[in-house]
Amino acid sequence: MNNKKTATNRKGMIPNRLNKFSIRKYSVGTASILVGTTLIFGLSGHEAKAAEHTNGELNQSKNETTAPSENKTTKKVDSRQLKDNTQTATADQPKVTMSDSATVKETSSNMQSPQNATANQSTTKTSNVTTNDKSSTTYSNETDKSNLTQAKDVSTTPKTTTIKPRTLNRMAVNTVAAPQQGTNVNDKVHFSNIDIAIDKGHVNQTTGKTEFWATSSDVLKLKANYTIDDSVKEGDTFTFKYGQYFRPGSVRLPSQTQNLYNAQGNIIAKGIYDSTTNTTTYTFTNYVDQYTNVRGSFEQVAFAKRKNATTDKTAYKMEVTLGNDTYSEEIIVDYGNKKAQPLISSTNYINNEDLSRNMTAYVNQPKNTYTKQTFVTNLTGYKFNPNAKNFKIYEVTDQNQFVDSFTPDTSKLKDVTDQFDVIYSNDNKTATVDLMKGQTSSNKQYIIQQVAYPDNSSTDNGKIDYTLDTDKTKYSWSNSYSNVNGSSTANGDQKKYNLGDYVWEDTNKDGKQDANEKGIKGVYVILKDSNGKELDRTTTDENGKYQFTGLSNGTYSVEFSTPAGYTPTTANVGTDDAVDSDGLTTTGVIKDADNMTLDSGFYKTPKYSLGDYVWYDSNKDGKQDSTEKGIKGVKVTLQNEKGEVIGTTETDENGKYRFDNLDSGKYKVIFEKPAGLTQTGTNTTEDDKDADGGEVDVTITDHDDFTLDNGYYEEETSDSDSDSDSDSDSDSDSDSDSDSDSDSDSDSDSDSDSDSDSDSDSDSDSDSDSDSDSDSDSDSDSDSDSDSDSDSDSDSDSDSDSDSDSDSDSDSDSDSDSDSDSDSDSDSDSDSDSDSDSDSDSDSDSDSDSDSDSDSDNDSDSDSDSDSDSDSDSDSDSDSDSDSDSDSDSDSDSDSDSDSDSDSDSDSDSDSDSDSDSDSDSDNDSDSDSDSDSDAGKHTPAKPMSTVKDQHKTAKALPETGSENNNSNNGTLFGGLFAALGSLLLFGRRKKQNK
């Protein structure tokens, strides 16, 4: 504390302890201080809907005309199914049509007057006549399960196929194994929304009911939705069973082949229709092995079964069982038989194979008596085949034998064909029979059946015209056919051929079939026509054989699927087409002979490996050295060309890794950097010894690749922490009190000099230097604490008393000198070298405290008596020097694998205290002069105090109450002198008296 007492100016404020004695001289002033943050059913076989037009005519009147109408088909899709399959594509199926239903146009008259009548019945030639038979198969969320090669994880084991040896003379054998026998899965094929509807239909004006007019272009439509369980396999079967009055097809008999297609025309199941049991048995193809969640809908053309549903205007129960689901509906059937008409005909059916028209004509249903009956048939676009002996004449013995359906039970009729001569003319396009045969009159009734074959030379639609020339009139009837969809024609019984051959494993990859090479089982083969429409599909048997049968002359396409784990061999090697491979897709031509040369060869796709080594590159040169070891547990990922992960592994204890079972192709190898390691330099030297980096693109082409390496070394990291704290505190306190009282008596000289000098120097230097160099993986810890305290204490007491009597000289000299030097030097030097894996931490604390306290009290009293000289000199000198130097130097070098810890503490305390008291008393008697000078000097270079003291003088001095002009000062001086003299005299007397 700066409590050093100093003497003030005579006009300043006197120290507190003296204020009470000065109240009368100074006025005391007071001051106030205010102190103030986010299904087609293809009834394939090319069945068509034919429109039959029959026309019976009298020459006087026409009572009824039914115009031919174009047959149309509609597709009905269950709305509920669509809702369940919003993600699937639904498309119209390819139309495999059947021209089975006929549109009948007939004109008849019930007039009995004998007139000449002309009957015209025409039939239009239909080639591959078809019905509008369509199927829509909707498959939702299907998963392809085909045996096409799929991307597999390289760690899996390829599925092996056992193939039995084939006969060495295979090329001389054209037979294939029996079709795969499956299981009936009626319980696994589920049908819903089954319906039998009349397409078009005719409304009976009397009853208001819709009727099925079988000879007037009407057909029936069987519709349903279906789903197939995923457990169904190729070869499994299910059935459609039609009831007593209901069958597939139209006026054209159903084809034996009935296929079920998907929306793209691919065959889901191949059906065989058995007319004896009126049942179609479907066998699933490999389609169901390729897809899951198969569901769809179909619409199939159907017809009344004429042999059972025989009577017009009668309701028959049309029933069908699809799988295990049964549905029935009553349908009113009408064939349009005119019982009063002497001549009427109808198409009994159209043969599905040769498209021949099987006709039935009723003659003299009314049982009229004639003397002339000539029956003539004229064909346009058709011909009779006299050698076929299919022109039959039956005599009716029972009127009921004229059944309305025009399909009489001929076993109950009397065959009288041999009694008549059938005369063919006009290139077998006209047949004439004289039904009287020498009789003069007759009322006999006949049923005549004929077969008309299409004539290729015809370019019109064709028709069949009948006339019955009697003695009364000439009757006529005409049957014509309109081809709704149109197709090619067949000439007689067209011969069918086979196409196919063999799929084999080409073990030597030469593209040719060798005697020791075996067939491949289970390869999918698809047959298409020249327009790309799928006709059939099959799967190779255990000997690699396949075959498509029942094919006409033409050009076909055969597609082979690539079996899993195989690669197609080279195609068309050499000149022998019988033993080479024709590739994945080939064209085969059938021209009046089987074509068994369509082969395809495959070899097992070779598998390759890649990999090698991950090592610790201790010298960081990017090359594998013999002394460098592998790194265990490094994760390695393999991606294919699409960026899909197909394998992961980890390096073994020797740093080795590999991926096996790879096909030729492009790959990427990704190394996952181990923790704590750094990627070494890449591609620095030959490919099998250098590091290839964290991600490596590689192409495998018919070879393994074991050059994919990578190297790492330990990471170079350095942690260096240097803290340097330097704290230097220096306190210097110097108080000097000087008090001088002087009483002077007459005629006395008193001289008192008091000098008080206090010097305090405090010097504190703290140097802290920390250098830290660190290299890879090095941690160094250096702590340096430097503390320097310097206290300097100096006490000096000086006491001088001087009494002087008259005529005496008193001389008192008091010198007090106190020097205190405090020097503190602290040097701290720490060097630390450490190698890798070390932390470097350098803390340097330097604290220097220097306290210097110097107190100097100087008290001088002087009494002077008359005629005496008193000289009192008091010098007080206090010097305090405090010097504190603290140097802290810390150097830390660290290199890999080294721990270094350096602590340096430096503590220096220096106390310096200097007190100086000086007291001088001098008494003089009368006749003396008293002069008192008091000098107080203070030197504190570190912290000057003079300015502070001056501020205090200014702030604390009491205001003067008197005038400050020289005159008043002089007056006061003289008054004081006189008072002093008086007091000296009085003091002198008392002193003498005391003596």
From Swiss-Prot:
The keyword Calcium applies. A motif (YSIRK-G/S signaling motif) lies at residues 21-32. Residues 72-83 have a biased composition (Basic and acidic residues). Residues 685-695, 712-934 have a biased composition (Acidic residues). Residues 51-495 are annotated as: Ligand binding A region. Residues 962-995 form a propeptide. It is a peptidoglycan-anchor. Residues 51-164, 678-975 are annotated as: Disordered. InterPro entries: Adhesin_Fg-bd_dom_2, Adhesion_dom_sf, Fibrogen-bd_dom1, Ig-like_fold, LPXTG_anchor, SDr-like, Sdr_B, SDR_Ig. Residues 960-975 have a biased composition (Low complexity). GO terms for cellular component: extracellular region. Keywords: Calcium, Cell wall, Peptidoglycan-anchor, Repeat, Secreted, Signal. Cell surface-associated calcium-binding protein which plays an important role in adhesion and pathogenesis. Mediates interactions with components of the extracellular matrix such as host NRXN1 to promote bacterial adhesion. Belongs to the serine-aspartate repeat-containing protein (SDr) family. This is Serine-aspartate repeat-containing protein C. The gene is sdrC.
